[in-house]
Amino acid sequence: METKLPPASTPTSPSSPGLSPVPPPDKVDGFSRRSLRRARPRRSHSSSQFRYQSNQQELTPLPLLKDVPASELHELLSRKLAQCGVMFDFLDCVADLKGKEVKRAALNELVECVGSTRGVLIEPVYPDIIRMISVNIFRTLPPSENPEFDPEEDEPNLEPSWPHLQLVYEFFLRFLESPDFQPSVAKRYVDQKFVLMLLELFDSEDPREREYLKTILHRVYGKFLGLRAYIRKQCNHIFLRFIYELEHFNGVAELLEILGSIINGFALPLKTEHKQFLVRVLIPLHSVKSLSVFHAQLAYCVVQFLEKDATLTEHVIRGLLKYWPKTCTQKEVMFLGEMEEILDVIEPSQFVKIQEPLFKQVARCVSSPHFQVAERALYFWNNEYILSLIEDNCHTVLPAVFGTLYQVSKEHWNQTIVSLIYNVLKTFMEMNGKLFDELTASYKLEKQQEQQKAQERQELWRGLEELRLRRLQGTQGAKEAPVPRPTPQVAASGGQS
């Protein structure tokens, strides 16, 4: 089903009379680039146009599969598969309308046949089926027309040949799901090269195509045991190139969704290969700029790993703290949400190992001037399981956050945040009143000492300033005083000859 997207406004050229005047450089806000950008309109940019055969023969309708005797069924099926391998130019809406309709009808019939007719998938038709699928779906994807393409703001380029391409994908899916499907026969044609080309298609901008590819690759992973390790390896390569080289790949969310299902089926104990995938691929994926596009799927994969092996918790949390965003509040809120999901499944023995660095980071988030970050961090205390972990380790957690909570409660500009902090402090006081009183007294004493030191510094600087002024006045006075002229010495004369 096509995703409904809001209509985009057409960009105005610099010479257009309706263009707003450009503000002077000193008035431009460098932080509002995203808000000033206009979403590019949806355009059809097909790669299938380069595969169009201009001198092809005109297609003619063939008899229906249900109307021929069983002895002629497979021969007619092969002819229809060959007919569906003919490509058309969909950028020209009025070209070859009859041929396009003949192919569409044939594809519809193939979809219905393979999904409902038993005994049609015999060994001789496998190469014809894979050939027809390959001709239609495998192509060089066009480069993105917008180098700054933002999936959240810009319209994707949709595939113009989708009326045919969708039916090919549907046929492929039903072919894989058919009760008559034989992986032992299909593995001669669905090999590593085929899978590699299938993975490359995940970079398509068309979300409808990526949705089909996600389901198909999952079926391939389940049917072909010999290809599983290869599929995981190639997914690793795609992610690593995305992190360290390209920083752009449209199908990351779909691939992570497949991997989430795969991780859920991993046998225990986990292999070293799987643990390395978590540490070297999934954790560094948190560092990319477009994290918001696939963060939900990524967080699911991480949590699945921790549910499989609790000993990985420390590696994961320290990795997230390493990549914690410093300037992007949107990503910071996502990190806090993922951290709460991790704490929901953490073992108490693992919590002890990471509680201090974790809650120091939570305290920094509470002190953030961005109220959404502070609010999301304070919501940790609304989680009953996290609250029980904090209560069991109150002597470590409370000293790590108390100073920040107390200070922010006096200084934060947002009254909602102040109210939430008061609730957290009240919870701590009920948990361990004695420790709370000790920390309160210690905090106040520390503040008094800081004020005393600040006052001593001010007095020291004031004394130094007075000393400088006295020396300056002394130097100026010495310069203004008259300099005595030297008296010439008279030669002694006593009448001596």
Curated annotation (Swiss-Prot):
Tissues with expression: Widely expressed at the mRNA level, with highest levels in cerebellum and lung.
Any single GO BP term: positive regulation of protein-containing complex assembly
UniProt GO MF annotations: protein phosphatase activator activity
Keywords for this protein: Cytoplasm, Phosphoprotein, Ubl conjugation
Predominant cellular place of this UniProt entry's protein: cytoplasm
Residues recorded as bearing Phosphoserine in the entry: S32, S35, S44, S46, S47, S48
Subcellular location: Cytoplasm
Top-level taxon: Eukaryota
Disulfide pairings: none
Example of a GO cellular component annotation carried by this entry: protein phosphatase type 2A complex
Region span, Disordered: 1-55, 473-497
Modification after translation: Ubiquitinated by CUL3-KLHL15 complex; this modification leads to proteasomal degradation.
Compositional bias (Low complexity): 1-19
SUPFAM superfamilies from the UniProt entry: ARM repeat (SSF48371)
Pfam families for the chain: B56
Basic residues biased stretches: 34-45
Function noted in UniProt: As the regulatory component of the serine/threonine-protein phosphatase 2A (PP2A) holoenzyme, modulates substrate specificity, subcellular localization, and responsiveness to phosphorylation. The phosphorylated form mediates the interaction between PP2A and AKT1, leading to AKT1 dephosphorylation.
Complexes and interactors: Component of the serine/threonine-protein phosphatase 2A complex (PP2A). This complex consists of a common heterodimeric core enzyme, composed of a 36 kDa catalytic subunit (subunit C) and a 65 kDa constant scaffold subunit (PR65 or subunit A), that associates with a variety of regulatory subunits. Proteins that associate with the core dimer include three families of regulatory subunits B (the R2/B/PR55/B55, R3/B''/PR72/PR130/PR59 and R5/B'/B56 families), the 48 kDa variable regulatory subunit, viral proteins, and cell signaling molecules. Interacts with SGO1. Interacts with AKT1.
Protein family (similarity comment): Belongs to the phosphatase 2A regulatory subunit B56 family.
Record's protein name: Serine/threonine-protein phosphatase 2A 56 kDa regulatory subunit beta isoform
Lineage start: Eukaryota, Metazoa, Chordata, Craniata, Vertebrata
